[in-house]
């Protein structure tokens, strides 16, 4: 084992935070220093040259002050027996740099602790504080890291002696292996294997448990029901299917695949052809697929990997739909118990305790969103939608007074994608078809995820919880998706016959499911499975849940093509078996010469015992709202701090919202970028205004009073959230229903049945809406011992509805931004509660630790449908200036958020809403506030009346310029406050979370910036006409110069980059680094090169640095790049990851010697912003006629801060006039202040060019916003092309 020291690992503020945590834990630590240390497992000693190359490879990241480690060593590494994602990717880079004798690289974090007065118990306490016990271990000596590379002999399969010991042997195995088998399933297995005349193996039992777990089989949703002694006519699943039977319109696939599919639009899908690799538009149907999953159990145990693999698994579900599909846009949601932010605890937050085996709600909301965002970011899928609810209270619900909350959290992961018409249905698995595992190797992780997540927290052994934690490698999943993309793009020649993702249960669930769904059996070889841990037993190899894997059936004649695609994308795969005529599973193990699995498929997946739920209804209790202690002014302040209501910027700016270039509505609204969007919208392609929308609906606390009302409201809210997009008819909307329940808890089962019936049998059929997809999680309870008391925290029944729809015109989407620049205006409330104004289970009751008695509900189904249809007319006719639905916090919050988005005031009169101001302002009945022009008010009110809404419409008042927020009832002032004051209250929760998680100085700067009342918002100043196509004369000549659209594994922004160059008149050619390294392509034939954004190698050796070093350490490819850069007629552009990469190639680029490096953002966080930049005077040929222009641009990076050697280096860069772009604030002043400058770069620098101007590198993404509709905000006068299109046309003009 080689040991190589790395760079300092923690910034000053991270060390300060660590010291503060030590202080809070009463640990007398005076100083901490941390640096990376690298360990290399080598097959042969490295030569001096190889050692130097490895040393250079491992020099990465920001240049932080070094000092010799002093104090006692605590070395934090991945757990022995596991392989970290860092290791997988760093080893790939080493191999691509010619260091083939390196078997594996691993990294640790070496803490040098100065704490001379710590006793041994305190050292153990400190070690626990420094690492995640689920993922890491702590050593006290560097040599102990040798354990990371320990190799073990494979363990043999174990047999369970049922022939000798009978039922007791199965019962013991059930406990030992954590199988969560029911008694009737034990009986079933005993009968089955006795009939086969042999003892089952541990792997067969484990496989059965996973395949038949509640997680995978949905037993409760398929159960028979008896309620109050009366047999019920339908299962839960049949009631959901009733929506499809009633309204099958536009649904192409439901209930039978990894995701549902509905009709989309005929558009030009943009991708490179297989023959020539040239990008072009292909006119075809882009149907819409939809899926929403939950990943609750792993997120409670270890939030980052739990949430990350939740998003990753859902992305795989989308990609594995039909014969291969394309994930496009994602959503993430969280329900947790109270945060109790230190120093910011809220009046309603009591600490009821929790078990040690799960983390706190604060931990979940600190780490979980980062994990979900990081996976989506690295994979290259924008996360555009979400929700965040906290609930934890002692309430009087159906079962009397008890604790209700989310100690077992909800982690929601979902999204939409596109699929070709001819790939919607799975193909036929032919006998002899090759059975393939695509993706990374097996590792001993995530064992038991399906069975573990099917148990209430506290029922399973803590070691089994530990075993079910997973790890994420989104860059590997991206490689696999690129393979799937290449396959579906082949159309009828697609080599994929059948595909499933690998999720719960690993291959033990995926492979039987694959062959069974294809009507076949399978014969497999265990030792052909890619395996990074050969010491695993057969059970561990077959059943582990290593992520980023798919199982496929490929025709033998197509294997050569499939192999070629995988090699080019560097996506590992293994052929592990063949499909058989007989529906039988045979798993051979050539190492031991036996068959760990040899069983008929119908034993595994056949008629296992059907569940019967015999339950009793309980009536909700609740308590009348006690108003004595409620003051309206105090209520407003509390509600503005409630996470379900409060600003969620801290959850949003960590997630890339612009990748693909097809995002037309993200969470951030208007010139002030306020996170209040009601829904997410994407364009169907890069050449179309057709699109897709998705929205969420969720009202879980209402279930504590009325199960069915809670479910109806979830559907209603999803509809009111999506209503201000141009959809057309209501039946175009399709829903995903995710049901979370504590099955078995008194009253909950019958409540679940009533809720499903309310939606599946009544509401959705009446609205003609289908639920073609969904998921259930039936173990939402946590048990623990608190002192001598046994406690339980039970989740409310929680239905999360996601609405999906095809969009007629993405430009018609209306946002909550109030407009004061459109003349006199009117604000109208459409109250679908029709005056009921119920306050039960609202934000108001929650912040006063009450529940109330009567909740909101869908009062009139016809009016709900009429409301949607009326909004469709108003959207199509462009009569709406602003729209925002009423939800958490009620009317007051709706108006406040609209005013925040418009940076304006409101004056309203609520007299028509009744005499109870508290109920009028804080009820959460369905509805919306719309803003219309004053002169159109009468017409709008008539249209609403024509749709049956006459009794729901109330004129409130108007939006006004300024900082007022005034609510009156007739002549009485009900509430008056500055809008800016409300805005700061609303922002405080996000600010406090950001301070805890990121650089607190940056969080403080952002909070301070929100207090600038003179902020004009994003604005534009152009020195050129963006409507002028300066490339047109050259395009007319029909000469299309070739641009090499360069990507490395992990790059994810190449398609939109190719589209921008294509529009400017180039032939954009897909060039993978593997093409250059293998000599299949060279740069000789290209006049332009663009290095694209993303996460090459997952940024493990510094952003873009691994990519650059794979060029620098390969002599032939290095020479090729150097020759290209020295050719006097070439152009080169590097964006984001490509910018970082090219900055590390500056020794090859003439006139680039003053270029800086790009390192970790000052905030120490990934930053996704829509930032204002100014084009500086520089030689850049890409920006030659844009100098002086100021306009917003997409920013998405974690490592964009300019790093120079010293002040002299910065001065030389400036004096050479090589700075091409700078961040400016909304006043147009160059800035280093966060967040206007999202990465902290000196002098606002965010792009530089070479002396000749032929090579330009920039951190922001012009390719994602070259279309006007792809800008989060834009002036109304812009046409199809945004001003950033000029960059690409300048390049085309330059080439003549």
From Swiss-Prot:
Mg(2+) binds at residues 678, 717, 721, 885. Signal peptide: none annotated. The keyword ATP-binding applies. Pathway: Purine metabolism; IMP biosynthesis via de novo pathway; 5-amino-1-(5-phospho-D-ribosyl)imidazole from N(2)-formyl-N(1)-(5-phospho-D-ribosyl)glycinamide: step 1/2. Its EC number is 6.3.5.3. It is found in: Cytoplasm. Monomer. This is Phosphoribosylformylglycinamidine synthase. The lineage of its organism: Bacteria, Pseudomonadati, Pseudomonadota, Gammaproteobacteria, Enterobacterales.
């Amino acid at each position: 084992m080689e040991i190589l020291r790395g760079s300092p690992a923690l910034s000053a503020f991270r060390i300060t935070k660590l010291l503060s945590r030590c202080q809070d834990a009463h640990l007398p630590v005076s100083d901490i220093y941390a640096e990376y240390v690298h360990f290399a497992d080598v097959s042969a000693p490295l030569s001096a040259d190889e050692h130097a190359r490895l040393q250079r490879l491992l020099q990465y990241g920001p240049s932080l002050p070094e000092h010799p480690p002093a104090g006692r060593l605590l070395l934090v590494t991945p757990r022995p027996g596991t392989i970290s994602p860092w290791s997988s990717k760093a080893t790939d880079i080493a191999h691509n740099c010619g260091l083939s004798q390196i078997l594996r690289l691993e990294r640790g974090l070496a803490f040098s602790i100065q704490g001379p007065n710590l006793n041994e118990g305190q050292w153990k306490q400190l070690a626990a504080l420094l690492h995640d016990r689920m993922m890491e271990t702590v050593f006290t000596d560097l040599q102990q890291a040798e354990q990371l590379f320990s190799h073990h002999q494979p363990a043999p399969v174990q047999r369970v002696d049922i022939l000798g010991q009978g039922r007791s042997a199965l019962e013991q195995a059930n406990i030992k292996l954590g199988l969560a088998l029911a008694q009737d399933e034990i009986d079933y297995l005993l009968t089955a294997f006795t009939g086969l005349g042999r003892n089952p193996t541990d792997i067969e039992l484990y496989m059965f448990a996973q395949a038949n777990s509640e997680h995978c089989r949905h037993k409760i949703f398929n159960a028979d029901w008896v309620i109050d002694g009366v047999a019920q006519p339908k299962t839960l699943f049949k009631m959901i299917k009733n929506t499809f039977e009633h309204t099958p319109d536009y649904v192409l696939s439901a209930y039978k695949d990894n995701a549902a599919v509905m009709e989309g639009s005929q558009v030009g899908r943009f991708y490179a052809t297989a023959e020539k690799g040239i990008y072009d538009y292909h006119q075809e149907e882009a149907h819409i697929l939809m899926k929403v999953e939950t990943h609750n159990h792993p997120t409670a145990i270890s939030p980052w990997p739990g949430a990350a693999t939740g998003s990753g698994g859902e992305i795989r579900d989308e990609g594995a739909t039909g014969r291969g599909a394309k994930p496009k846009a994602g959503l993430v949601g969280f329900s947790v118990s109270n945060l109790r932010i230190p120093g910011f605890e809220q009046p309603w937050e009591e600490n009821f305790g929790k078990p040690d085996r799960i983390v706190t709600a604060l931990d979940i909301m600190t780490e979980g969103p980062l994990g979900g965002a990081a996976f989506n970011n690295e994979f290259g899928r924008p996360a555009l939608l979400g929700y965040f609810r906290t609930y934890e209270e002692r309430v009087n619900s159906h079962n009397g007074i008890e604790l209700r909350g989310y100690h077992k959290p909800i982690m929601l992961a979902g999204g939409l994608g596109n699929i070709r018409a001819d790939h919607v249905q799975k193909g036929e698995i032919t006998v002899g078809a090759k059975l393939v595992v695509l993706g990374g190797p097996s590792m001993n992780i995530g064992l038991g995820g399906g069975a573990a997540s099917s148990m209430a927290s506290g029922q399973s052994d803590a070691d089994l919880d530990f075993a079910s934690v997973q790890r994420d490698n989104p860059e590997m999943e991206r490689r696999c998706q690129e393979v799937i993309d290449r396959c579906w793009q082949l159309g009828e020649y697609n080599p994929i016959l059948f595909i499933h993702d690998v999720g719960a249960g690993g291959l033990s669930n995926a492979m039987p499911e694959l062959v069974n769904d294809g009507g076949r059996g399978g014969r497999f070889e265990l030792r052909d499975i890619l395996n990074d841990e050969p010491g695993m037993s057969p059970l561990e190899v077959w059943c582990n849940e290593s992520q980023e894997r798919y199982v496929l059936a490929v025709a033998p004649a197509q294997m050569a093509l499939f192999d070629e695609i995988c090699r080019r994308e560097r996506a590992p795969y293994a052929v592990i078996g063949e499909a058989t005529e007989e529906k039988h599973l045979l798993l051979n193990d050539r190492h031991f010469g036996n068959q760990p699995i040899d069983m008929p498929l119908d034993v595994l997946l056949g008629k296992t015992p059907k569940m019967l739920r015999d339950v009793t209804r309980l009536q909700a209790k609740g308590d009348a709202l006690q108003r004595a202690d409620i003051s309206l002014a105090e209520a407003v302040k509390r509600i503005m701090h409630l996470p379900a209501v409060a600003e969620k910027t801290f959850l949003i700016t960590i997630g890339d919202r612009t990748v693909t270039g097809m995002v037309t509505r993200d969470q951030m609204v208007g010139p002030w970028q306020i996170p209040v969007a009601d829904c997410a919208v994407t364009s169907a392609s890069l050449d179309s205004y057709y699109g897709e929308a998705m929205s969420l609906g969720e009202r879980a606390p209402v279930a504590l009073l009325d199960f069915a009302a809670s479910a109806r409201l979830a559907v209603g809210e999803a509809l009111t959230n999506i209503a201000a997009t141009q959809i057309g008819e209501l039946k175009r909307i399709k829903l995903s229903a995710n049901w979370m329940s504590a099955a078995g808890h008194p009253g909950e089962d019958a409540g679940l049945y009533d809720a499903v019936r309310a939606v599946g049998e009544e509401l959705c059929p009446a609205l003609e809406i289908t639920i073609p997809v969904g998921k259930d999680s039936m173990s939402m309870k946590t048990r623990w011992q608190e002192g001598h008391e046994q406690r339980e925290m039970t989740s409310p029944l929680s239905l999360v509805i996601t609405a999906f729809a095809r969009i007629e015109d993405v430009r018609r989407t209306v946002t909550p931004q109030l407009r004061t620049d459109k003349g006199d205006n009117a604000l109208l409330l459409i109250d679908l509660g029709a005056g009921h104004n119920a306050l039960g289970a609202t934000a108001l009751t929650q912040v006063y630790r009450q529940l109330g008695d009567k909740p909101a509900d869908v009062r009139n189904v016809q009016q709900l449908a009429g409301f949607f249809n009326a909004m469709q007319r108003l959207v199509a006719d462009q009569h709406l200036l602003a729209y925002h639905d009423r939800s958490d916090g009620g009317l007051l919050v709706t108006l406040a958020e609209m005013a925040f988005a418009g940076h304006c005031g409101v004056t309203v009169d609520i007299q028509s809403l009744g005499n109870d101001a508290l109920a009028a302002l804080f009820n959460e009945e369905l509805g919306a506030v719309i803003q219309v022009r004053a002169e159109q008010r009468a017409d709008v009110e008539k249209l609403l009346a024509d749709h049956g809404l006459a009794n729901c419409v109330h004129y409130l008042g108007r939006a006004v310029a300024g900082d007022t927020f005034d609510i009156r009832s007739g002549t009485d002032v009900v509430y008056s406050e500055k809008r800016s004051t409300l805005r700061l209250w609303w922002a405080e929760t996000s600010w406090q979370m950001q301070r805890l998680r990121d650089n607190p100085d940056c969080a403080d700067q952002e909070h301070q910036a929100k207090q600038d009342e003179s902020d004009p918002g994003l604005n534009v100043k152009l020195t050129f006409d963006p409507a002028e196509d300066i490339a047109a004369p050259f395009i007319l000549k029909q000469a299309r110069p070739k641009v090499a659209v360069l990507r490395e594994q992990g790059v994810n922004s190449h398609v939109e980059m190719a589209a921008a160059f294509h529009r400017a008149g180039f032939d954009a050619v897909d060039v993978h680094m593997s093409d250059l390294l293998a000599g299949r392509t060279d740069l000789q034939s290209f006049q332009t090169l663009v290095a694209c954004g993303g996460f090459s190698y997952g940024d493990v050796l510094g952003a873009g640095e691994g990519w650059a070093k794979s060029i620098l350490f390969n002599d032939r490819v290095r020479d090729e790049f150097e020759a290209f850069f020295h050719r006097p007629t070439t152009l080169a552009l590097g964006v984001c990851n490509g910018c970082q990469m090219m900055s590390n190639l500056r020794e090859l680029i003439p006139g680039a010697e003053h270029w800086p490096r790009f390192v970790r953002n000052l905030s120490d966080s990934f930053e996704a912003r829509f930032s204002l930049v100014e084009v500086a005077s520089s030689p850049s040929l890409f920006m030659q006629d844009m100098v002086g222009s100021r306009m917003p641009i997409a920013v998405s990076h974690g490592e964009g801060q300019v790093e120079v050697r010293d002040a002299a280096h910065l001065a030389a860069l400036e004096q050479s006039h090589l700075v091409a772009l700078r961040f400016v604030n909304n006043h147009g002043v160059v800035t280093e202040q966060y967040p206007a400058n999202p990465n902290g770069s000196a002098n606002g620098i965010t792009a530089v060019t070479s002396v000749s101007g032929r090579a330009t590198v920039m951190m922001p993404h012009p390719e994602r916003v070259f279309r006007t509709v792809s800008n989060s905000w834009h002036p109304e006068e812009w046409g199809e092309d945004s001003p950033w299109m000029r960059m690409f046309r300048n390049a085309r003009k330059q080439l003549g």
